[in-house]
């Protein structure tokens, strides 16, 4: 057992989970949380694991992607989910919590652990061994240190996320595959096309613009206000600049002849492949601040997307995150130091559960490394493993944060048409595989019910 003290930078969900996993595996840990010495615009307390936005961890149903990820985390002994259960309030199938009770439960467990100490104050350099889990509001000084280490373009400070649609929910009798002017990096792309294209008539385009302009926009928090860059304006902001703006921007039809009519459409919405398997496609240029209900209503009015299944919704907000596929190892360590792990939203995951999950695996893997072993990643048939695969294999040129969704998972060996049954089969396979993986690598669950000394 290594006697090296581990530094956790950031006492949020991911940092707290990582600290617990390491301490339960016999490592001495110091959690550094900069609050209250350095305040943020989002936090209201000094507590570790403060929930600054919603008070829900989303669904617990394993036929839901978020519920499946929770089930996998429970198998591994998640502190965060233990605390959420302790603080649970009525919320139907959602794991809703009392924020104060939740944060208190996490902090009290960490404070009571004989191997964990908590220090308040800002960390401005990158320690080793460590887990960097500073979240979307990473301090300027540490962000500068990360950029110096990873490269000037490796760290983003705002995300502009376009919705992602499930391939099998797209109407391929309406949508056609093509690249603009027949261009492509490979012969297959030039022959078949790299994009899915939704052609619009003038009437359809005008109706779409009306719906887009009438959509209800998320106002956000003061800390969440993102400066709009000309290269990634919200789609509704572009529409507000003039009714033809989108038609001469991301919806320009030139070079995309509709094979059914032999003519260019009045406007074309393009979808670009998001994953290697081709099951997830994002709406190109459709970063948006529309509320979720209006995103679904407005974007389903696009020809070919009437039954679109949204695997990820669009957003624009303050979010410090690393271009993980370009900058980190598959285990989310620095490439020049395998004892510095990143976890939480800074890796490019979205959501409370996803952030906590990466903290859990970072803690497990740093423990393995300190004991002379290698990091291990669950198979991509599990939600945790599939998230890590996305962070490893996503296109670095178009990398955007991702939440848990079934489109990330390996396809089932035998197709399933019924959506509910398909998700149940995904879940059954994932839970069996996480158990096998856990057994293969002798990963005992770090159960929060008892402190290990």
Annotate each language-model stretch with its function:
Residues 2-14:
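Beta1/beta-strand and adjacent pyrophosphate-binding region of the FAD-binding site
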Residues 5, 28, 154:
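Residues at the starts of beta-strands that form the adenosine-phosphate
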Residues 20-82, 380-391:
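N-terminal FAD cofactor-binding segment of flavoenzymes
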Residues 60-107, 111:
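A conserved beta-strand/loop capping segment in the N-terminal third of enzymes
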Residues 88, 401-453:
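C-terminal auxiliary extensions adjacent to catalytic cores
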Residues 109-297:
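Predominantly flavin-linked oxidoreductase catalytic cores and closely associated redox partners
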Residues 283-349, 356-358, 376-393, 401-403, ...:
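A glycine-rich dinucleotide-binding beta-alpha-beta segment and adjacent secondary-structure elements
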Residues 355-376:
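Internal hydrophobic alpha-helix adjacent to the cofactor/substrate pocket in enzyme cavities
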């Amino acid at each position: 057992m290594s006697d090296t003290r581990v530094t956790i930078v950031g006492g949020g969900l991911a940092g707290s989970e990582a600290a617990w996993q390491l301490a339960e595996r016999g490592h001495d840990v110091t959690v550094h949380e900069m609050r209250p010495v350095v305040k943020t615009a989002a936090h209201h307390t000094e507590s570790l694991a403060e929930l600054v936005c919603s008070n829900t961890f989303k669904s617990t149903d394993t036929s839901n992607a978020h519920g499946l990820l929770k089930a996998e985390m429970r198998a591994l002994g998640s502190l965060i989910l233990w605390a959420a259960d302790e603080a649970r309030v009525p919320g139907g199938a959602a794991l809703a919590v009392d924020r104060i009770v939740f944060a208190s439960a996490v902090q009290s467990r960490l404070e009571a652990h004989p191997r964990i100490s908590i220090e308040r104050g800002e960390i401005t350099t990158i320690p080793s061994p460590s887990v960097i889990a500073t979240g979307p509001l990473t301090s300027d000084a540490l962000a500068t240190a990360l950029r110096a280490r990873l490269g000037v373009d490796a760290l983003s400070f705002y995300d502009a996320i376009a919705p992602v649609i499930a391939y099998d929910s797209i109407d391929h009798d309406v949508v056609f595959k093509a690249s603009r002017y027949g261009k492509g990096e490979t012969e297959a792309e030039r022959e078949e096309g790299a994009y899915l294209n939704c052609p619009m008539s003038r009437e359809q385009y005008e109706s779409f613009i009306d719906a887009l302009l009438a959509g209800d926009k998320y106002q956000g928090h003061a800390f969440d206000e993102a400066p709009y860059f000309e290269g990634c304006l919200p789609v509704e902001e572009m529409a507000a600049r003039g009714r033809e703006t989108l038609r001469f921007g991301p919806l320009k039809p030139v070079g995309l002849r509709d094979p059914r009519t032999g003519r260019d459409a009045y406007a074309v919405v393009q979808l670009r492949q998001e994953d290697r398997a081709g099951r997830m496609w994002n709406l190109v240029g459709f970063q948006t601040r529309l509320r979720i209900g209006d995103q679904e209503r407005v974007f389903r009015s696009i020809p070919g997307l009437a039954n679109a299944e949204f695997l990820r919704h669009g957003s624009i907000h303050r979010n410090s995150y690393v271009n993980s596929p370009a900058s980190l190892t598959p285990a989310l360590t620095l490439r020049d130091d395998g004892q510095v792990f990143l976890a939480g939203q800074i890796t490019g995951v979205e959501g409370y559960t996803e952030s906590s999950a990466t903290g859990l695996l970072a803690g497990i893997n740093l423990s393995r490394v300190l004991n002379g072993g290698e990091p291990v990643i669950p198979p991509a048939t599990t939600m945790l493993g599939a998230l890590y695969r996305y962070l490893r294999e996503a296109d670095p040129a178009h990398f955007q944060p991702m939440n848990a969704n079934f489109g990330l998972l390996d396809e089932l060996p035998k197709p399933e048409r019924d959506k509910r049954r398909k998700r149940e089969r995904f879940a059954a396979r994932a839970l069996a595989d996480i158990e096998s993986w856990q057994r293969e690598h002798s990963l005992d669950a770090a159960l929060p019910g008892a402190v290990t000394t």
